[in-house]
Amino acid sequence: MKEQSPAPELWSTIDALSEWLDTNRPVEGREGLLLRILKLTEEVGEVSEAVIGATGQNPRKGVTHTWEDVQAELCDVVITALVALRTLTPEAREVFGGHLERVRERSVGSK
């Protein structure tokens, strides 16, 4: 598989999704913010469901998902996390980039 960097429009898409959600948010203020962050839990649960389905761990249901389903659900987790970060700060791109660099330095950068 060819390695790809994030699409150039990643952050503009995250901004657009955040704005769209803000426009259509049924709950405002702190509660709305908390609900947006809690959405991550729902998405992670969907990853778990897909893994269980891909491995056939539920004998009553058998194999119900594919590993491509797991990939899609993981992408949903990433998107939801970035939208939540963008909701917390308009500098989400810089915050994420700085944090990613710190993680890189303390792991692969320390070799």
Annotate each predicted stretch with a short phrase.
Residues M1-K111:
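Flexible "arm" and connector segments at domain edges
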